[in-house]
């Protein structure tokens, strides 16, 4: 039984929505941001990387993009653009199971530092549900949507059952999803090295072809990583020294109001997640029409008009997080979302692709 514990404080955020917010801020600052474009190969001049050849996946248009500095920030796939060099990433996958909030008493997260094999287990309230995780399994094939192994699912359910109000079963899992970690491998590490022993720090390399490669790290240090990349670029003469300046980030004008201060990511999703843009959301058609828990028609339209959403997956996985919270609900509402996307002018909404994806997030 439980003999004692330690209370501490940590941060929590919505990674996908935060990434979209960063992209929008970049556009506002003058950046050109391309969505749904795939890099096909690098462009060279006199043995130096000077850009990329890309393709717009929606229109099929070929794009030759040139830049003074090309940065390879492709996470676990970083080594695919440095085939002549020693691989620096030892990929690892972490599995997460989502269950209803009643499995965890209260709204505080629970961290169990000791499990049967030495890994930690966490139960974190998030957007009206509870995330259970995680695992640390080496992975070399690097699919875009990795699948959880049966033994990983069994481990999480078994260990969670020892500390939660009641033991969760496979039938209780609303969604299962997997993240890939770009862990940096020391030069002396072997293929047998345990991934949980590898560094979570970032790594930057300037290739002989004049291309910067960065991988590793985590969201907590993303600004420090960006500053480090710019510093390397300036030192290599790829960018001016002035590019390294990282201005402080000011909070939104309403971030300190009593109403905003009460917002928590433990709450079920809703208009409160839009912060100072709630008034914009309220003016869109379908503001009062709920399509699924925490998702309204207006939110779908907002995702297209202001958040660069083009497909059903964009909306249900990367703007709303419904796929990660309740895969069955996401699968059910997908046709309605597809129709709204088409109304908003999106031509290739990829409904069938999303339905297939949603099945892989279901255990039952």
Language-model regions, residue ranges each:
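Glycine-rich phosphate/pyrophosphate-binding loop
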Residues: 1-4
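C-terminal accessory subdomains/tails of enzymes that are appended
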Residues: 7-17, 28-29, 44, 74-76, ...
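Short beta-strand segments that buttress and anchor functional surface loops
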Residues: 7-8, 53-56
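A conserved short coil-to-beta-strand element within the FAD-binding core of flavoproteins
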Residues: 35-50
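Short, hydrophobic/aromatic-rich segments at coil-to-beta transitions
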Residues: 48-52, 107-108
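Core beta-strand elements of the Rossmann-like FAD/NAD(P) dinucleotide-binding domain
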Residues: 58-69
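Flavin (primarily FAD) binding-site architecture
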Residues: 72-86
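Extended, Lys/Arg-enriched charged tracts that mediate electrostatic binding to polyanionic substrates
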Residues: 87, 93, 101-104
């Amino acid at each position: 039984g439980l003999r004692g514990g330690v209370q501490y404080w940590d941060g929590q955020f919505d990674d996908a929505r935060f990434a979209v917010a960063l992209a929008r801020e970049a556009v506002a600052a003058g950046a050109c941001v391309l969505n749904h474009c795939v890099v096909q190969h690098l462009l060279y001049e006199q043995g130096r990387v000077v850009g990329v050849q890309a393709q717009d996946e929606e229109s099929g248009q070929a794009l030759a993009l040139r830049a003074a500095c090309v940065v390879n920030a492709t996470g676990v796939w970083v080594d695919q653009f440095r085939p002549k060099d020693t691989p620096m990433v030892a990929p690892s996958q972490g599995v997460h199971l989502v269950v209803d909030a009643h499995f965890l008493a209260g709204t505080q997260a629970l961290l169990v530092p000791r499990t049967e094999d030495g890994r930690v287990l966490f139960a974190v309230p998030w957007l009206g549900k509870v995330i259970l995780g995680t695992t640390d399994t080496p992975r070399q094939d690097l699919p875009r949507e990795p699948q959880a192994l049966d033994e990983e699912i069994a481990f999480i359910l078994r260990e969670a059952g020892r500390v939660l109000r009641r033991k969760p079963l496979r039938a209780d899992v609303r969604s299962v999803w997997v993240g890939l970690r770009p862990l940096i491998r020391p030069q002396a590490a072997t293929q047998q090295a345990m991934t949980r022993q590898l560094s979570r720090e970032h790594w930057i390399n300037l290739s002989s072809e004049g291309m910067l490669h960065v991988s590793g790290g985590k969201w907590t240090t993303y600004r420090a990583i960006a500053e480090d990349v710019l510093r390397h670029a300036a030192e290599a003469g790829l960018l001016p020294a002035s590019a390294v300046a990282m201005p402080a980030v000011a909070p939104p004008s309403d971030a300190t109001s009593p109403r905003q201060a009460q917002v928590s990511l433990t709450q079920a999703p809703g208009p409160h997640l839009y912060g100072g843009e709630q008034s914009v959301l309220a003016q869109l058609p379908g503001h009062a029409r709920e399509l699924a828990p925490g998702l309204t028609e207006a939110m779908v339209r907002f995702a297209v008009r202001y958040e660069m959403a083009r497909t059903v997956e964009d909306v249900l996985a990367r703007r709303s997080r419904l796929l990660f919270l309740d895969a069955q609900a996401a699968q059910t509402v997908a046709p309605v979302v597809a129709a709204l996307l088409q109304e908003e002018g999106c031509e290739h909404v990829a409904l069938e692709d999303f339905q297939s994806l949603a099945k892989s997030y279901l255990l039952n």
